[in-house]
Each structure stands twice: as structure tokens, then as C-alpha cells.
Amino acid sequence: MPNRYYEKDGNLDFLAGRTVAIIGYGSQGHAHALNLRDSGVDVVVGLPAGSKSTAKAEAAGLKVLSPADAAKTANVVMILVPDHIQADLYNNEIAPHMTAGKTLMFAHGFNIHFGQIKPPVDIDVTMVAPKAPGHRVRELYTEGVGVPALVAVHQNATGQALERALAYALALGCLKAGVIDTNFREETESDLFGEQAVLCGGAAELVRAGFQTLVDAGYAPEIAYFECLHELKLIVDLIQEGGLSYMRYSVSDTAEYGDYTRGPRVVNDQTRAEMKKILSEIQSGEFARQWIEENKTGRKNFLAMREKGHNDQIEVVGRELREMMTFLKKKKEVGVPVA
């Protein structure tokens, strides 16, 4: 079993006298910056000129610098911008300032594992990856609870890489819940697989296929939406709270029997074979090469798929039905970014 770390294993002294640069101020960036600041860590935020996030960070009382100046000022640099822009940002603005003894940190291992970022050998390279979106990382920190996280050491030039990563996790609030030891390869490959085969790709296609099956059979799209998409959250919440057994305990016996007898016909041997193929494509670097090339050539295919998905019947019906659901937090409907 991998090592697990808790509050007793972290020591903020390993960040004492050090400045941490949070590069980016999005979902994770704002949570990391605010939590570390509130834990007594000296924090600066690195944002490009003209960033819309600058005003938000400054309103929160944080010092904002350019990414280059933030990296120059800091002893610890946490990169929390999207995967596809990390390499250029690192190479152009951060790398020149990663002098011996500094720490380069990530919340996801994509660019290190697939060689898009190649740090010098005389710095520490670590990961602290909270297993929750940024708003939950911040919310639970303020409640004194914290979210679980993963920790990994890729380079240990100083001999204190793990200790500093655990100090960061402590300041972030994650050691209250517990942090599990991993490595960059395991985190990256398992994270991508989970996204592609289960959480995003798998779940989305399952929902779309179920919806379309009912609609093609003559059922009202509105009914199909409720049965195949809307109620999914109810089931996922039960699974997250207590596992599959708790979900099955909580639903009707009819639903549970259908689970046992029909579920394996949906996710069958052919599905499992495709899952293995998807994992193999991740492990070999094929997916990474495809995604990197997509970004280098203007994201034409990606943006076309995004627009097509936005205009699917299930999405059109969903936008209409959510107007009825006053119990949902009112959120602006998401459009389709063109770039």
C-alpha cells in the first residue's frame, strides 16, 4: 500500500522564509493562493499582463506579478495553468529563474511525465494534487476539514523535496483529510484514464447513448433527459458517499436487480477491451502526442467537437428543462468558446 500522510507528518517550517509563486488564478490557483496565504505562507501570484484574474487576486489581498517576476522572486513555483499552455509558459518565462535549490510544483503530472517540461537537475520537482475542484479545496479549508490529495516527488535535489511538498499540502489543508503517496507516471496515466474511460468520456457517451435509445424508440426527449442525465447525480452522490454497496442499498430492489443483471450487458467484454486499448494509448504516449499536436495546429478538431456536443439534442433539451428547476443554483448557460 502507498504511504499516507496526515497533519502530524507536515511541518510548515520547511516553507518558513520562502516565497511561493502560484502561477495562474483559476479554479485551483485561487484556492492554493488563498489557503497558503491564510496558513501564513508568503504568496505571490503570477499572471500575464491583461489577465482578467488580476483584479480578483488583488481584491483578495494578493500580490500579483508577471509569471517571470513571480518565478524570479519565489523559492517555490506551483504551476496551475491549463496543461496545454504550461510548456510554453515554463520555457519562456519560468525556466530562466529556476536556479539551484528551488522547487517546481504541479497539481498534475502531464507535462513532466510526457517530457514537455524538462527541469534542470539541481531543483526539486514535486506534485500536490488535491482530489477536488478548487472551490471545494477553498470551501473545506475554511471549514477546517480539507480535501484528500496525492503527493509525488520527481526530483529530490535538496534532499527535502518530500518534506517541502508535505508542508505545502499542510498549508493547503489537505493533510487534515490525508495525502496519498504516488509518482508522476501513476498519477498522470490513471488520471487521464479515469477522465477518458469513466468520468468524462465514458459517462458522457453512456448518457448520450441511453438518451438516444429512448428518443429513437419514441419516448419524449424530456422524459429521456430526466431518466438518463438528470438523475445521474442522485446515483453518483450515493456512490461517492458510501460506495457501490451503499448506492444499491439506497435504490429500489427493482433497480438493484436491474443493475446486477443488465449492467454487465452494457459494459461488456468489448467495452473492457476498449478500456485496455485506451489505457495502452495513454501509457505509450499516443494520446499525449495527439493532444499536443492538436494544440500546435490550432485546435480545429477539438473546437469542432466541442461545438457539436453543445448543439446535441440532449443539450438543447437540458437547457430548456433546467429553466424549470428552481432548486438548482442559477448558473449562466455555458456557450461555446471559439478559441
Curated annotation (Swiss-Prot):
Binding site for NADP(+): Y25, G26, S27, Q28, S51, S53, D83, H84, I85, Q86, G134
Protein known as: Ketol-acid reductoisomerase (NADP(+))
Function: Involved in the biosynthesis of branched-chain amino acids (BCAA). Catalyzes an alkyl-migration followed by a ketol-acid reduction of (S)-2-acetolactate (S2AL) to yield (R)-2,3-dihydroxy-isovalerate. In the isomerase reaction, S2AL is rearranged via a Mg-dependent methyl migration to produce 3-hydroxy-3-methyl-2-ketobutyrate (HMKB). In the reductase reaction, this 2-ketoacid undergoes a metal-dependent reduction by NADPH to yield (R)-2,3-dihydroxy-isovalerate.
Keyword Metal-binding: yes
Binding site for substrate: S252
Cofactor note: Binds 2 magnesium ions per subunit.
Family: Belongs to the ketol-acid reductoisomerase family.
Required cofactor names: Mg(2+)
Keywords: Amino-acid biosynthesis, Branched-chain amino acid biosynthesis, Magnesium, Metal-binding, NADP, Oxidoreductase
Enzyme type, top EC level: oxidoreductase
UniProt-listed Pfam families: KARI_C, KARI_N
Record-linked NCBIfam families: ilvC (TIGR00465), PRK05479.1 (NF004017), PRK13403.1 (NF009940)
Keyword Magnesium appears in the UniProt entry: yes
Residues given in the record as Mg(2+) 2 binding sites: D191, E227, E231
InterPro entries named in the record: 6-PGluconate_DH-like_C_sf, KARI, KARI_C, KARI_N, KARI_prok, NAD(P)-bd_dom_sf
EC number: 1.1.1.86
Active site: H108
Gene it is expressed from: ilvC
Single biological process term from Gene Ontology: L-valine biosynthetic process
Residues of the KARI C-terminal knotted domain: 183-328
